[in-house]
Amino acid sequence: MNYQILNAYPDVKTLAAWQDFLADAAYPTHYITPGFFTDPFIRGGERFAVLAFEGEKIAAVLTGVDTGKTIVSGLAVRPQTVFRKETDRAAAAKALLEGMLEKGGDSLEVINFHTWEPVEKSKSLGFSSEVCSGGDAVVMLDLAKGADVLFKDFSQTRQSELKKAMKKSELIVKDLETDGEIDELYAIHVEWNKRKGNLPDSREDFSRLAADKDNRKTLIAVYQGKVIAGTFFRFCSAPGGGVIEYAGNNSLEEFQKLRPNPLIGWRAIEWACANNLTHFSMGASHEFLRRFGGDIRSNYRYTFDRTFLKRHEKKEKLKKLLVGTYLFLPVSARRKIKQAFGIT
């Protein structure tokens, strides 16, 4: 296989080949479509894509960011490497690696990329690999089951709270549409990030998010005319069916007793089932998401370390060892460590 590196939106010929790939790709998501190059929420470096070709057809697509010394493609909970169904994933991964090495040049030290499916013979290509379990796993729903069957797979707690929420006639879930709704949700977004100690997105990017009907869906919960919550989703509407991903939520704490977020999640599942999407990735696997049923899916992380004695790999292993040791400690000991470092 050979490869092509892109640093911007593709030309007409490449776009056609890319669209053909998406129709036969396993787990196509928004961030492995050409829309990756125009999405306002890609940050952290220069964005690029590597396309692995087998003849005239694309066999795999990888998107990511290049920071100079590091190339990163996706996260454990959000892979940005996808293969055509039935393709030789090892051969495709080799072509993708060659493309990333060319993209990074002499200054490149380490590559990290993530996949939904395992890459056979990855060690022979020079990769270290890891199954992303635990907190790096995701809840995945098979939308082919249909909304009614999926609802029955929800936990009893989730079914009960949804039935109660749906009885509240003043609580509705709808698409984010008007400027007034955008203003209300943006105010919640700013306050939510303030509580978390994060920087909010710009009002301009927020407006673009609401305007994007091809790759994103934002659902809001409105109670007595007031926006009280909003959840953001990304999706790929490939001809063969794509994946929808939970991308984030902002909500008002004082209205959580109304259960707006579970209701938004349910309406999103209903919409996805009705719109030819094949899988719903919840983007994480904590208890709130597990109550939607589905499978706990562990994706794959691959690292290619070019440094002397593989410095980056060793640093990452030490970090995981320290985190694992910390989590194993009694709560009282963890509290003292937090106090010592001024962590609240």
Where are these regions (language model features)?
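Amphipathic coiled-coil/heptad-repeat helices and related helical stalk/stem segments
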Residues: 92-93, 158, 202, 265
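A gly/proline- and charged-residue-enriched helix-loop-helix capping module
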Residues: 74-117
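A short, structural micro-pattern
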Residues: 58, 75, 104, 132-135, ...
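Short, high-confidence coil segments that cap the C-terminus of an alpha-helix
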Residues: 45-47, 102-106, 274-277
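Short catalytic-loop micro-motif centered on adjacent basic/acidic residues
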Residues: 107-110, 174, 278-281
